[in-house]
């Protein structure tokens, strides 16, 4: 598993544009064909649906939002719905 997390998005609430993120994940996967790629970097209940719509992301690395059980559970529910 490879976790991609842009340094500028850690704890900022900012995420890459969907096209940019899709292209970056594709690049990583082309170089590392046998690995899953998860995304981390300001994943929260407000943006997880947008991130989930990027179909080449294999999962999420939850940082600060995992410290709040309500937010963490909300992310999990939204990920699997």
Task: Give short role names for the model-derived ranges.
Residues 76-80:
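Short, hydrophobic alpha-helical segments
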Residues 5, 51, 63:
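Conserved, mostly hydrophobic/aromatic
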Residues 30-34, 55-56, 81:
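Short helix-capping segments at alpha-helix termini
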Residues 17-25, 52-61:
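Short, electropositive alpha-helical surface patch
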Residues 28, 51, 72-75:
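Hydrophobic packing residues within well-ordered alpha-helices of enzyme cores
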Residues 8-14, 42, 56-75:
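Glycine-rich phosphate-binding active-site loops on the catalytic face of alpha/beta enzymes
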Residues 1-34, 38:
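Active-site rim beta-loop-alpha module in soluble metabolic enzymes
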């Amino acid at each position: 598993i490879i976790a991609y997390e842009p340094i500028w998005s850690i704890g900022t609430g900012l995420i890459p544009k969907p096209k940019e993120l899709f292209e970056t994940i594709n690049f990583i996967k082309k170089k590392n064909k046998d690995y899953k790629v998860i995304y981390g970097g300001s994943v929260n209940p407000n943006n997880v649906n947008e991130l989930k719509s990027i179909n080449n992301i294999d999962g999420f690395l939850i940082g600060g939002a995992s410290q709040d059980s309500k937010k963490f559970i909300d992310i999990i529910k939204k990920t699997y719905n």
